A protein has these predicted regions:
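Soluble "head" domains of membrane/secretory-pathway proteins
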Residues: 2-17, 36-42, 50-201
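Hydrophobic membrane-insertion alpha-helices, especially the h-region
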Residues: 18-36
């Protein structure tokens, strides 16, 4: 008679081994999804009011970023999209690691803030246009006195709460954001349940 295998003689070890494999698969699968498909973020601070609020749970779509990188390109979001990106000024313990803002302008465009109005100038609009008109704006004047031309490989972003110092963004100290720091566009507000909402992607 053939000798029983080790696992046959120790069935509990077989069960434990199967459980370990399952846990490893779950961890690896979660990491892959977070890296390449979507990620979840929580909003902190008032910078995106009246659109997003502290405690809102967001789903960020990683797929367009992943597809761009697979083609050896940088991902460029659309004007007006709400995006999450790595904070260029981040240092442990002093700043938020990731920020959420709205895309205002792209490389080569000139952005001005004057008398409470944000204006973008480009080849298509040499006299300038107000991007806030496309999404009903922040609902309040834009603070600051700014004039900047967006450098290559970067975007100009701003919060929706632009009065005073509620939003650190490209107007007032954050600077323009490198495309390689963009994590992805916000596709869904998942929480609170009473405010579930999809966003432009």
């Amino acid at each position: 008679m053939m000798e029983a295998s080790f696992l046959t003689r120790h069935p509990r070890l077989k069960d434990i081994g199967g459980f370990v494999v399952f846990v490893v698969c779950v961890i690896v699968g979660t990491l892959l999804i977070n890296t390449f498909v979507f990620r979840s973020f929580s909003v902190t601070g008032p910078s995106m009011e009246q659109t997003l609020y502290t405690g809102d749970r967001l789903i960020v779509n990683r797929l367009p970023v992943t597809m761009a990188h697979l083609q050896n390109n940088s991902y460029t979001p659309k004007r007006g999209q709400i995006i999450v990106f790595k904070n260029p000024l981040y240092s442990p313990g002093s700043e938020d690691m990731n920020l959420v803002k709205r895309v205002i302008a792209f490389a080569g465009e000139r952005v001005t803030v004057k008398d409470g109005t944000l204006t973008v100038y480009n080849k298509e609009h040499p006299q300038g246009f107000h991007p806030d008109d496309s999404w009903d704006g922040p609902g309040s004047p834009t603070s600051g006195d700014t004039e900047v031309t967006v450098p290559e490989g970067s975007i100009f972003v701003a919060g929706d709460h632009r009065q005073g110092s509620y939003s650190l963004d490209s107007r007032n100290g954050l600077g323009t954001v490198p495309l390689y720091d963009v994590i992805g566009p916000v596709s869904l507000r998942l929480w609170p349940l009473t405010k579930v909402q999809g966003f432009q992607i």
